[in-house]
From Swiss-Prot:
Known function: One of the primary rRNA binding proteins, it binds directly to 16S rRNA where it nucleates assembly of the body of the 30S subunit. With S5 and S12 plays an important role in translational accuracy.
Disulfide topology: none
Presence of keyword RNA-binding: yes
Keyword rRNA-binding in record: yes
Protein name, as recorded: Small ribosomal subunit protein uS4
Subunit structure: Part of the 30S ribosomal subunit. Contacts protein S5. The interaction surface between S4 and S5 is involved in control of translational fidelity.
Spans annotated as Disordered: 22-41
Any Pfam family: S4
Gene giving rise to this polypeptide: rpsD
Single GO MF annotation: structural constituent of ribosome
Amino acid sequence: MSRYTGPSWKLSRRLGISLSGTGKEIEKRPYAPGQHGPNQRKKLSEYGLQLQEKQKLRHMYGMNERQFRTLFNRAGKMKGVHGENFMILLETRLDNLVYRLGLARTRRGARQLVNHGHILVDGKRVDIPSFSVKPGQTISLREKSQNLAVVGEAIEVNNFVPDYLTFDADKKEGTFTRLPERSELSAEINESFIVEYYSR
């Protein structure tokens, strides 16, 4: 299954969660897209709830099914709670941390920065969005990319950096100081549904 590249607002409304991170798409029209959107929310089966939760999280991080399932399986081999480990591994993705630092306004925008070679990890260029950043590693912009308008605009509007990151806006550089706690991650996701979905 390929990664979704269609209109993110329409998908956000279908899943009932903001994929842009701004919440505007849900705030403006808090119902599914289509002619009968306001009236077509129906009660989902147990399987439907599990599938919806998986789709929410997969699209939130902009991953295809193969990438998502591979990371899920990796989380299952770690000590601790499978679902929580999965959420934490997702958070360590380079494109996600570029977004969390405020260098991009959306995860999609962060993924483009990484793909186009604008991002350094510990001073070395990394152009793989799924690269897993380790605690203690530093994320920064290439010298030639320091004055990108999209980055400056993103930093200007960002007013929150998670406690597991530090960020120097002048240097446009951040450090992933530690792994996040589950309580610091999205409360809109019930990862136990995803574990149940893949355990069928």
